[in-house]
Amino acid sequence: KDAPAVAISINSPGGSPVQSRLIFQRIRDLAAEKNKQVLVFVEDVAASGGYMIALAGDEIFADPTSIVGSIGVVSGGFGFPEMLKKIGVERRVYTAGTNKAILDPFQPERENEIEYLKSLQLEIHQVFIDMVKARRGGKLADDPDLFSGLFWTGTRGRALGLVDGLADMRSE
């Protein structure tokens, strides 16, 4: 017997934007191919890449205490430019390409490298924003923090238009 819909449970704080978008796209492609409605149920968290995947749902449901949102992009690292010198190690790096060692944690940060990284982040962030707007459309509240990287409870997420209702997969 054919099921009228597919239910997906999400419990993810995020991860790679590439992998999140690929999962989103595969779900949407299968939904179109099989002519199935997709219902997404957020458990503890659907934040950042987890929320990007949740966008594959035709409807998104969350527990009142679930965490949803975090529509932003983060990159992190460490800097150790003085550490090797202190312990008497000489680091040798040879590259072909003037930018091959960009953001090397053993070299001081350079402003042009930081600007480049931020430009990539802004581009990826815009892809995420566009996905949210395309999938949630007129359901979204007009809130300046919506795309700031903040995250909210399921209850607040519903008020913001990030989720459609408060329920879990076992609700009737």
Feature map (PLM): residue ranges:
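A generic structural-conservation signal
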Residues: 7, 40, 93, 142, ...
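Assembly/oligomerization interface modules of large self-assembling protein complexes
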Residues: 32, 114-172
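Glycine-rich beta-to-alpha transition loops that act as phosphate-gripper elements at the mouths
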Residues: 40-47, 146-150
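Small-residue-centered hinge/linker elements
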Residues: 1-36, 45-52, 57-135
